[in-house]
């Protein structure tokens, strides 16, 4: 079927990085961070897709229809029975890949948001559909929810599908992300999880997860106690020993440090902006490997899409 979208129709998308789990909130809590991938998508009059990747991943990720962003666009068009037009994409990537900062979720959300903008006026895609589509591709909503909606998100799945609740983060929370050179496969990290955990550990994490929500939205001084975990971080230590050692070192020194997502990046949640610098200095002093310190804000908007050109003629 021929696409009815006008040739030259162009949308611009911005998607934030995310950090999932935040210590105790395994597969549930996620935080949007002010570090962004930008995407421009233009409808062309020839079939297929081209992708110009700039920044992170340039020369490494696919530049054709197998690119994850293109796959997400196609998934969304198919979900609403819309023919896929030919597309030219320009991806300006800043989110590190394979570091536990939601890069794959950001790519998926970028594609879905681009499809929403391209189809605006033809098909209206609401927030529930955005989350459902993203979760279908990512497999779980803890990263895609904050990428879509910003802020702190609680994500869960019930009989109606994936759900989320967005919460505003206390302005005193100052995230620091420490990014190593090494990468980590999410699949590998998940494979290290045991099939069951002791009952007391489950209770421990339930209490800390509840406390963490309170700490992030109103009581940042509780962040150190609130970010304790017994469900996943130590089980994955063998795959990222230095990350695990640095988490324990930072916590011993009073910093609310956790593994970001599946790792191997570190996330430090401070109530004092000055703590970020001293935490970064401590890691630089103790590690023989380079770590990049990113002093970020919490993103409050989530993903955005804007139609910047309506185009001129129907695409072939």
From Swiss-Prot:
One Gene Ontology cellular component annotation held by this UniProt entry: cytoplasm
Cited InterPro entries: GHMP_kinase_C_dom (IPR013750), GHMP_kinase_C_sf (IPR036554), GHMP_kinase_N_dom (IPR006204), GHMP_knse_ATP-bd_CS (IPR006203), Homoserine_kinase (IPR000870), Ribosomal_Su5_D2-typ_SF (IPR020568), Ribsml_uS5_D2-typ_fold_subgr (IPR014721)
NADP as UniProt keyword: no
Catalytic activity reported: L-homoserine + ATP = O-phospho-L-homoserine + ADP + H(+)
Keyword Amino-acid biosynthesis recorded: yes
Function: Catalyzes the ATP-dependent phosphorylation of L-homoserine to L-homoserine phosphate.
Protein name: Homoserine kinase
Species in which this protein is naturally found: Clavibacter michiganensis subsp. michiganensis (strain NCPPB 382)
